[in-house]
Every structure is written in C-alpha cells, then in structure tokens.
C-alpha cells in the first residue's frame, strides 16, 4: 500500500455542508436545539457570578449575623438557575440527537442510491464492495457524530465562553482584558491539534478501508482460500494494513495529549496572571475579592469551555473527512444515469439492434481496444448468435446493448434511435438479460424472481417459474418460494440459480432478450426444458445469444463469428457450413471431436448440472434457509445478551499482557496526572484567602501563588502527552492484536461456519472494524481513567480532611451527587450517538449484495427496489435513535439541576457552620474547592475517554469468535503426512446434510472407491450432490457418518493443510482476487514463493500464456474485483494455472471447462489431459466428451451412487440412469 494515496485522503468538506441534506423538520429541530444549547451555555457563567457574590458574603462578614441570610438568598438563586438549565439542556440534547439521527440516515441512503446509479465503469475503476460497506457502516457513524448532539454541545460551550466574557467585562474590565491575552494561545494550540488529528485519522480510516477490503475478498471466497491454503497470505496482507493504521493511531494519541498539556499550561498560567494582577487591582482600584475571583473563574471556565469544545472539533474534523469521500461520490454525475428520466419513451419498440462503427475499450484498461470499428445489424424478431474465442468481445456486445458502457465512438442503435437518446430505465425495462454467472440477492426466491417486474403478483411469479422449469424444485424446498437463497445464491445449485434467473427475465417480458451463456450451468433434463422455455419466449422477440456450445446456436437466424473484436463471418448455420475453411466450420470441427459427443453436445448442461451447492459457493456461503436464518438470528441476540455479562475484565486485560511495562509506566504518569486538579483546588482556596489579607501580605502571597500556578502548568505539559502516548501504544497494539487474532480465527473457521447468516463477509468485515476498536476502551483507556480518578479522589480527600473534617464529611455526603451527576453527563455526552452497529449489519448486507451484483441491479432497474429493502431495514434504527434522544435529554437536564442544587446546599451548610463558629470561611472554600475540583477533574478526564459500555458488547462478539473452536481447522498441525501419496480415495457409507438445511439429506450411505491415477467422472442431475463430493474430499465439511480415506488413511487423521495441498481444485465460477495475474497464479503455492519460471510454465500448460502476454501489462495486469476484468474463459485458464502451480497429486475439476469456447476448451482440455496423467482426477461435468474418456463414471442419484462403470458398460444397461441421460441428450440435440 503506497503512502501516497493515504496522504491524499485528508481532504474534508466545509462544515455547513454536512447539513446539506436536512429538511424543514430538521431545520426547526436544529433551531430549537441551538436556542436550548445557548441558554444552557449561559447558565454556567451566571453560576460564577453567584459564586462571586457568595465569596463577598462570606469573606468579610466573618462573625456577622447576616451571613446566613445573605448566603441563603444566593443559594436560592442557584436552585432557580438549575431549573432553567434543566429545560435548556433537555431541548439541546433531544433536538440535536433526533435531527442528527435523521440526517445521517438520509445521507446513508442517498449514498447507497448514488452508488446504485453510477455507471458500471465506476465499479471497474473506483469502487469496491468492501469500500462501500466500510463507508456505509464506518464513515456514516463519524458523520453522525459530527452533526448530532456534538453540535449542540459545541454551541453550549461556545455560549458559555461568550457569556462568560460578557459577565467578566461587566465585573472588572481591566482584569478581564489582561487575562484575555491568553486566549489566542489557547485557540492556536486547539487549532493545530485539530489539523494534525484530522490527518492522522484520515490515514487511519484509509488503511482500515483497505484492510476491510482484504476481509471482504478473503471471506467472500473462503472456499478458494481454504482450498489453496491461502490463509497465511490473507493474514499477512491484513496485518500489513492494520500496522499502518496502528502507527497513525499512536501519532494521534500523542498529539492529542500534547494539545491537552499545552492547554492546561495556558490555563494555569492564566490563573497565575489573574492572581498576580488581581492582587494589584484590589490594592489600586478597590476591586472586591469576590469580583476578582468572579472574573478569574469566569475567564478561565469560559476558556475551559473552549478547550472542552476540542473533542467536538475532533469529531467535526473526523466527520468532515469521512464526508468528503461520501459526498464526492454523492455528487458524482454518472456518465450513464439510471435515475435520469429524460430521454425518449416510445409506444413500444420493434427491437432492431444495430452497432455502427463502434470503438470501445473498458474504463479499467483504456489502452486496450476491444472493438475498433465494430458493426453488426440484428433485425427485429430474429435470433442472432455470437460465437468466437474466449475474450473475443462477445459479452462486450451484450454490455453495450444493455448500456452498461457507452462506446468511445460509433453508435448503438435500437430501432434506429441511438441508445443514449432513450430514457435509460425505460429501455432497460425492454431488455431481459440472463448471464453466465447468475447473480441472486440474499433474500427469498420469490423476491429474487420479483426483481423482474415491479409489483408482480404471486401468480405471475409462479407462472414465470413454471416457464423456466424452476417450479418443480422450488416446490420440493421446505419453504417453497419463501426459501432464502443465501449470499450470492449459495444455497442453490448452479442449475437452480440459473432457472431462477431465467424466471426473473421471463417475468420482465422483454422485447429484447440477451442470453449470455444462459444454459451453461444446467443438466440435460433442465437444459432441454429451459431451452424449450427460452424457445417459447424467444418467439417474436429479438434475441442475442452468446454461447460456446455451437449446438445451442444452430437454430439462430444469424450466426456472427467474432475474432479479436471483428466480425469475420456472418450467416445462418447452413450457409456458414458451406465454406469448409471458414472460421465457423473450424470452430465446429473443433467441437465435433467425434460424432457422438457432437450429437450430445447440446448438453451444455449435459449429463450433469451446475453442481450442487458446492461449487457456486466458491462465491460465498451465507444465509441459510429462511426459518433457520430467523431462528439463528434470534438465537444470536439472546446469546449476546447472556454473554454480555460474562466476559470478565481479566480476560480482556490478559490480551494486553505484552504491554504491561508500558501500562505500568503509563499508570504512574497517570497518577501524577490525577493529582493536578485537587492541587489546583488548594491553590485556589489559598488565593481567595490571600485576597482578604492585609495589603503587604496580599502583595507577597499573590506573587508566590502565581509562581506555583505556573509550575503546575509545566507539570501538565509533561504529564498529559506522556500518559496519552503510552496508552495509545498499549491500546493500539491491543486493537492490532485483536484484529489479527480475530481475522486469523475467522479465516481458519470450517467452511460450514460461513453458511450461517450472521457470518457473511459483510457482517464479519463490519465486526472486525468496529468491535476491535471498541475493546480498547475497556483496557488501556479505562485503566488510564481509573488511575487518574483514584489519584484525584485520594488527593482530594486528604486535602479536604486536613482542612476541616466536619465540612468535609457534610460535603462528602453531598458530593456523590456531583459524582453521579458528572457520570450521568459524561454517559450522555459519550453514549448519545446511537449504537448503530448491529442494526446496520443487516442493512449493510443489502448494500453489499447490491453493489456486488451491480450489473444485475442495473439490468433489472432494481435500484429503487434495493433502496426500499435498505430503508425498511433502517427504520428501526431511526426510531430507536429518536427514543434515545428523548431519554438522554431528560437525563442530561436533570443532571444540571442536581449540580446547581448541590452547590447551593454545600454553601448553605458551610454558612451555618461558620455562623456557629465551628469553622472559618477559608476552610469551607478549601474543602469545597478540593472536592468539587476533584469531581470536575474526574468528570473531565472521563469526558475525554471513549465510552466503554459499547466495548463490553464488542468484547462479547470478539470473544465469541476467538473462543469458537473451528471444527475443521487448517492451522491444526497434528495429523499424519504421507511420505508418498499414491492417490487411492475411498468414500465409505457416507451420509451428509448441510447444517443450514438439516432436513435435506444430500447423501445417504454413499460408497465410491477411486483408484490411484484413475479419472472418475461424477454425473447426475442438478443438485444431486456431485460438487458436495468435492467439498467433502477437501474437508470443507465432514460427513455426518461414514468415512473417507486417502491411501487407506482416514482424512480426519491427516494434517489438514498438507491434505489440501495435495489437491488442485478448479471450479465452475473461478474466484480470482483483486490483484495481478501473476499473484493470482502464484496463489496456488499456498503462501510459498512461486518462481517466475513456475508461473510461466503453469500458464503455458493452462493455455493462458498467450492471452496474458498479449495484454498490455502482461502478468502484471490487475484482474479487478472477482476477476471482472477478464472474460470467463480467461479467468478459468488463470484458475487452472493456479491449480497446476500447486503440482497436486489429486485434481478436482468442478465443471472446469464449462465456461470456455471451443478453441480454448480444446487447448485447456489438452492441458488438463496432460496434467491428469499419473494423477487421480475427479471430474464433475456435463459434457459427454469430457466424461466419456473417464476410467470410471459414477452416477449420483438420490444420495447414493446409482451406477458406476465405463461409458461402454453403462450405455448398454437397459433402462439404466446413465443410458437414459445419454438418450435424453440425443433427443435434445435432434
């Protein structure tokens, strides 16, 4: 990660812009809240005014009868002031919290809406799914923090500042002027800190955003990671990024501490100045002691208010930095805007499509031209098939017709009108897309089909699923249409997903139908029926088909052969066949390896299907079936409530063990830190006493105490940064340790764990980023705080009891109220911003899904539907935010009232004791100041400390991950390693169900033996469990009963990492990481370095070297998120090279060539044939040509192996399963 781009992220938006999205209600709330905040702020300087009066009342009238009466009046005024503060504080907090919650929710949904309306190029180049989710969960919390009650608090503090100075000027303008000189220093130190903190926090944010991208990529393709034992690599790149964040964190801590230290130096020097000059004023200008104290306290407390505004400023700056990226996106005008309602809307379209002189290159690779002057005419109502090599630009044609991209030059026309002139939403509504890797959303089957049409009825949805031949398998599911499909549709097999995608397109009833390899993942039976369904809906529609299986395209009216971005031939099947040397004939010849395979060719989904749920889950396994999902959901909240009491402090502290020396040092410095305020209390009492002494003593004492004040300030400058720095190191290291522990734990969980709804990549990413940071508040920060507070308390009590034990005891009885009040205020001050975490996890999953499958969202114009789902999931959050605002407001208001009443009682009691001659007024002040300043010190220290209540919940969720023992842990070093692997595999009496679907038995008593060096093909219908065999062999899951052996040793007894290294997996939807091609191939080595020679050898074997070398950056080309920058065939070849680099003893090919065109398939098949030599190979496939040459063909049906033998044997079994599957194909192709 380059430093450069971290630096760039420190831009911010102007503050007013945060409120850009408020409505009239918000404006009203903000006005009322601000009035409340101003009133509340002025209460504090008014209190100092009353304090001055008290001093004058008690000072000179030592033995006067009037003392109690004068003091009583002042005390009563204090109580009234408290009542006023109560109302003002309530308005301040409640209004600002409510409006903040409302506006943040609005920003969040606007951001998602903007993301959804961006053109596809934006996602190729600028934005990744992880980043969107990170910004929506992390950055909006920072924004909310900057525009909610922190603004109210800020206004309150500023009005304290202004009000204070007005009062100070009225009471003694000269002294005030002199003391004012310290304010610029204060402001400057505050400003400098805000700037540096912003920079550090922006860098930290950027590093974390990249780290959460690593999490999203790794967990989103956990099967690939596990299969290639890539856990270590993921860990090391994650650690590198969190280390960067740690460094920013420490820097931030030190700077904040330095800022506080400098501020306190300025405060205490201001008191020093006031004491010295105030003494002079009493002597020369006849000021009263009360007036001098009033001015001093007012000036300083007003300045303190300014200092207390610094955390608000920090929050504002962090919020402005977070908003910059989000607002930049919100304001980005997409090149192709779905929400733009301008443009033509016709009665209807005929559906004639023309590409005229199109030049085009993908935004992510602008220098590589895909088309240079490409032209193609598709008459309305006809079916045109595009054929050609992988990467020749067939799917690009479809992207251009859908207007995912605009051509660089040339035009795409429909009915002679340029696509750009149509209203985008309307024209996309006329186009139906079914693509090669169908994308489903984490919701029910019904909702997924419903994306095809706004407000579709259940009947329409059922009819569409019948047409797509999906009704049968849906009815078999326990919940039917209400079944949840999981993240990226992982709960369904490839064939099932594809049929739902087709039903979704059918429901749309489009004029133009785009089929991008639409039947490539289906088994023979489904394919025949789906093909019929497609044939039925293709009537009278313009259809564009991209297919590799040439048999699917024979009936097309026009076949266009594309080669390197040019049409080299065009015509019908029979016309093109006449030219024996033509490109089409050559492609066909490649596929006609022999007559039979040719006849069966149509079986794109030939003898088997897109596998049971195993391979597609290379995607990511998430939600389970809906009922279970709901149960699991309830269970986990219950669990978290039960557990939240159970995580002991010692347990968390143990994690900080390595930092004990730092913590001890920090604690000692922190203790010194804690004594500063109580000592300040004594000094202050001494100054009050000095002001009522004889002139010569007054002169001497005021000078002496001034010097002491300055020394106290110097101590603060040393102590604050040191404490903060030490605790930042300890806290930062703890966060870093927890993050890497958790991530390590999660990466090594068994694959089945990710099938649970709460463990989706989105949710885990959010947890790793938010929770780890919160735990820090429980250890370092809270230790630091406790030490400061204990030191303050002890010092305060010693001072108070030495002065006057009677007053001390009475004040002590009352002081807990100040403590409680301080605690409540801080609790509210910190805990206001609603705990957004859990509520947003669900909502971020919606966002995660939509952004991850943005093409599907765009092609079905489902943006508004996604927004609705998102808003629905956010409703409760806003409601609870409002509720919290009201409760916090009441609490905050009451706390002020209590504070003022307590002050009043203290002085009333003190006055009575002075009158009774039990004590003198100096001691009353000393006790009062020592104790109240201790309380102030404690609450002030606490107000700077982050809130630990959320930390407890976070600790529970973190420890739940750390404590969970992975059922199948690849770190486990125990287990045998075989010297020499032959490759005999035996599955004995296997029964198996997926945990998330315990009522669907996948295998019951399945037996299969595979001899070393044999190639075994698994065939069977879609969903019969073929891919599950592959998942079991890699120990993604363990069977419920029975056992699997390798060379006679049970898999569970072998070392897991070693076992996975013996197997090379190539799946149907290859998962590549957002990294270079080189890194993706080298990934096969499982964390060991792969040499350049090995990488090139592997890609040559996989027939990838040629296409890689032809790309501009060659092996250094970045493949994009989920490999989006490469075509299906190119991705697959990179995936095969990755498996080959591993030099595995056992090859697992799960539909490995289903996404390739004839030419690549032949070469890849050759490559696979070469690599298969002397290796045990298990093939899941539906193409007969692939299956026919297998040594053994095993037919999976109803959870058992129904038949096994060679092609010749099985084909001759009368009425056998295999024979009838083959027969099906022959009929299908004829």
UniProtKB/Swiss-Prot annotation:
Gene3D superfamilies assigned: ABC transporter type 1, transmembrane domain, P-loop containing nucleotide triphosphate hydrolases
Positions annotated with a glycan in the UniProt record: 540, 615-616, 759, 1074, 1174, 1227
ABC transmembrane type-1 domain residues: 30-318, 663-950
Annotated binding of ATP 2, by residue: 1020-1027
Organism: Arabidopsis thaliana (Mouse-ear cress)
Protein localization: Membrane
Gene Ontology cellular component annotations, sorted alphabetically: cytosol; membrane
GO molecular function: ABC-type transporter activity; ATP binding; ATP hydrolysis activity
Keywords: ATP-binding, Glycoprotein, Membrane, Nucleotide-binding, Repeat, Transmembrane, Transmembrane helix, Transport
Chain residues that bind ATP 1: 388-395
Main location per the UniProt record: membrane
ABC transporter domain boundaries: 353-589, 985-1223
Family: Belongs to the ABC transporter superfamily. ABCB family. Multidrug resistance exporter (TC 3.A.1.201) subfamily.
InterPro entries in the record: AAA+_ATPase (IPR003593), ABC1_TM_dom (IPR011527), ABC1_TM_sf (IPR036640), ABC_transporter-like_ATP-bd (IPR003439), ABC_transporter-like_CS (IPR017871), P-loop_NTPase (IPR027417), Type_1_exporter (IPR039421)
Protein name: ABC transporter B family member 5
Superkingdom: Eukaryota
CDD domains xref list: ABC_6TM_Pgp_ABCB1_D1_like, ABC_6TM_Pgp_ABCB1_D2_like, ABC_MTABC3_MDL1_MDL2
């Amino acid at each position: 990660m380059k430093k450069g781009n971290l630096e760039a992220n420190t831009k911010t938006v102007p503050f007013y812009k945060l409120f850009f999205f408020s409505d009239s209600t918000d404006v009203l709330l903000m006005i009322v809240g601000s009035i409340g905040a101003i009133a509340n702020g002025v209460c504090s300087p008014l209190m100092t005014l009353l304090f001055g009066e008290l001093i004058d009342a008690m000072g000179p009238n030592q033995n006067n009868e009037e003392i109690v009466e004068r003091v009583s009046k002042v005390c009563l005024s204090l109580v009234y002031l408290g009542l006023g503060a109560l109302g003002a504080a309530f308005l301040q907090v409640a209004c600002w919290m409510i409006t903040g919650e409302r506006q943040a929710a609005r920003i969040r949904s606007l951001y998602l809406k903007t993301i959804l309306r961006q053109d596809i190029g934006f996602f190729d180049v600028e934005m990744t799914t992880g980043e969107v989710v990170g910004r929506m969960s992390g950055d909006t919390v920072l924004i909310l923090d900057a525009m909610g009650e922190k603004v109210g608090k800020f206004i309150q503090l500023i009005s304290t500042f202004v009000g204070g100075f007005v009062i100070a000027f009225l009471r003694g303008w000269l002294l005030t002027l002199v003391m004012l000189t310290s304010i610029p220093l204060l402001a400057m130190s505050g400003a400098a800190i805000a700037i540096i903190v912003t920079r550090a926090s922006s860098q930290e944010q950027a590093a974390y955003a990249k780290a959460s991208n690593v999490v999203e990529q790794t967990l989103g393709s956990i099967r690939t990671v596990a299969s290639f034992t890539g856990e270590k690599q993921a860990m090391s790149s994650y650690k590198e990024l969190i280390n960067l964040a740690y460094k920013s964190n420490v820097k931030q801590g030190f700077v904040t501490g330095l800022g506080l230290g400098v501020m306190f130096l300025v405060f205490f020097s201001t008191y020093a100045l006031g004491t010295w000059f105030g003494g002079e004023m009493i002597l020369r200008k006849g000021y009263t002691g009360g007036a001098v104290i009033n001015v001093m306290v007012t000036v300083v407390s007003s300045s303190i208010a300014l200092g207390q505004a610094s955390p608000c400023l920090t929050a504002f700056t962090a919020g402005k930095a977070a908003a910059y990226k989000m607002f930049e996106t919100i304001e980005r005008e997409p090149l192709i805007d779905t929400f733009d309602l301008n443009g033509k809307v016709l009665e209807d379209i005929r559906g004639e499509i023309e590409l005229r002189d199109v030049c085009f290159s993908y935004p992510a690779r602008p220098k590589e031209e895909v088309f240079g002057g490409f032209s193609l005419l598709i008459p309305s109502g006809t079916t045109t098939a595009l054929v050609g090599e992988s990467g020749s630009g067939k799917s690009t044609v479809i992207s251009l017709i859908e207007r995912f991209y605009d051509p660089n030059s040339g035009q795409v026309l429909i009915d002679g009108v340029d696509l750009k002139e149509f209203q985008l939403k309307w024209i996309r509504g006329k186009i139906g897309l079914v693509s090669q890797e169908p994308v489903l959303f984490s919701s029910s089957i019904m909702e997924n089909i419903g994306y095809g049409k706004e407000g579709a009825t259940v009947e329409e949805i059922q009819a569409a699923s019948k047409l797509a031949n999906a009704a049968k398998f849906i009815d078999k599911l326990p919940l039917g249409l209400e079944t949840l499909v999981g993240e990226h549709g992982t709960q369904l097999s490839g064939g099932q997903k594809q049929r739902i995608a087709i039903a979704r397109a059918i429901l749309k009833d489009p004029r133009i139908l785009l089929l991008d390899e639409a039947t490539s993942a289906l088994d023979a039976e489904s394919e025949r029926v789906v093909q019929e369904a497609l044939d039925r809906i293709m009537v009278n529609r313009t259809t564009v088909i991209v297919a590799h299986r040439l048999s699917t395209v024979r009936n097309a009216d026009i076949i266009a052969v594309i080669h390197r971005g040019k049409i080299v031939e065009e015509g019908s099947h029979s016309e093109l066949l006449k030219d024996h040397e033509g490109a089409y004939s050559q492609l066909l010849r490649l596929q006609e390896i022999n007559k039979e395979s040719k006849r069966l060719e149509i079986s794109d989904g030939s003898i088997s299907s897109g596998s049971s749920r195993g391979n597609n889950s290379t995607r990511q396994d998430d939600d389970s079936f809906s009922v279970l999902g709901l149960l699991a959901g309830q269970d986990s909240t219950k669990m978290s409530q039960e557990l939240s009491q159970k995580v002991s402090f010692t347990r968390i502290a143990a994690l900080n063990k390595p930092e004990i020396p730092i913590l001890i040092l920090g604690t000692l410095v922190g203790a010194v830190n804690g004594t500063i305020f109580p000592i300040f209390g004594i000094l202050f009492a001494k100054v009050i006493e000095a002001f009522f002494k004889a002139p010569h003593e007054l002169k001497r004492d005021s000078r002496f105490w001034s010097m002491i004040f300055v020394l106290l300030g110097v101590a603060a400058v040393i102590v604050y940064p040191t404490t903060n720095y030490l605790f930042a190191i300890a806290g930062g290291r703890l966060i870093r340790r927890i993050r890497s522990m958790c991530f390590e734990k999660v990466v090594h969980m068994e694959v089945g764990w990710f099938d649970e709804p709460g463990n989706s990549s989105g949710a885990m990413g959010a947890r790793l980023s938010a929770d780890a940071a919160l735990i820090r508040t429980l250890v370092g920060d809270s230790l630091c705080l406790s030490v400061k507070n204990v030191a303050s308390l002890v010092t305060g009590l010693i001072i108070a009891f030495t002065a006057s034990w009677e007053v001390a005891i009475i004040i002590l009885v009352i002081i807990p109220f100040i403590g409680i009040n301080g605690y409540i205020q801080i609790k509210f001050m910190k805990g206001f911003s609603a705990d957004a975490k859990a509520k947003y996890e669900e909502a971020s999953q919606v966002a995660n899904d939509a952004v991850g499958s943005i093409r599907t969202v765009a092609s079905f114009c489902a943006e508004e539907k996604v927004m609705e789902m998102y808003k629905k999931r956010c409703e409760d959050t806003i409601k609870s935010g409002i509720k919290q605002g009201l409760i916090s407001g009441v609490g905050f208001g009451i706390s002020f009232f209590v504070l003022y009443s307590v002050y009043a009682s203290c002085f009333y009691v003190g006055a009575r004791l002075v009158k009774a001659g039990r004590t003198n007024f100096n001691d009353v002040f000393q006790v009062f100041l020592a104790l109240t300043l201790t309380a102030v010190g404690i609450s002030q220290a606490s107000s700077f400390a982050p809130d630990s209540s959320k930390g407890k919940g976070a600790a529970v969720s973190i420890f739940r991950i750390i404590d969970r023992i992975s059922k199948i842990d690849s770190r486990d070093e125990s287990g045998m390693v075989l010297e020499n692997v032959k490759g005999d595999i035996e599955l004995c009496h296997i029964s198996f169900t997926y945990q998330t679907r315990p009522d669907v038995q996948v295998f019951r008593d399945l037996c299969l033996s595979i001899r070393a060096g044999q190639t075994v093909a698994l065939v069977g219908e879609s969903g019969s469990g073929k891919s599950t065999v592959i998942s079991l062999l890699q120990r993604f899951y363990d069977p419920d009963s029975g056992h699997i052996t390798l060379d006679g040793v049970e898999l569970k007894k072998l070392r897991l990492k070693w076992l996975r290294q013996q197997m090379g997996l190539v799946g149907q939807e290859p998962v590549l990481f957002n990294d270079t091609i080189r890194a993706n191939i080298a990934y096969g080595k499982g964390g060991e370095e792969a040499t350049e020679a090995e990488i090139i050898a592997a890609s040559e074997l996989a027939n990838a070297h040629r296409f890689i070398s032809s790309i501009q950056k060659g092996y250094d080309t970045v493949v994009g998120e989920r490999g989006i920058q490469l075509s299906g065939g190119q991705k697959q070849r990179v995936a095969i090279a990755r498996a080959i680099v591993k030099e595995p003893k056992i090859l697992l090919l799960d539909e490995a060539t289903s996404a390739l065109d004839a030419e690549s398939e032949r070469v890849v098949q050759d490559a696979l044939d070469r690599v298969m030599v002397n290796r045990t190979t298990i093939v899941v496939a539906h193409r007969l040509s692939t299956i026919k040459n297998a040594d053994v063909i095993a037919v999976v049906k109803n959870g058992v192996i129904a038949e096994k033998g060679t092609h010749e044997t099985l084909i001759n079994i009368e009425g056998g399963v295999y024979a009838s599957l083959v027969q099906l194909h022959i009929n299908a192709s004829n």
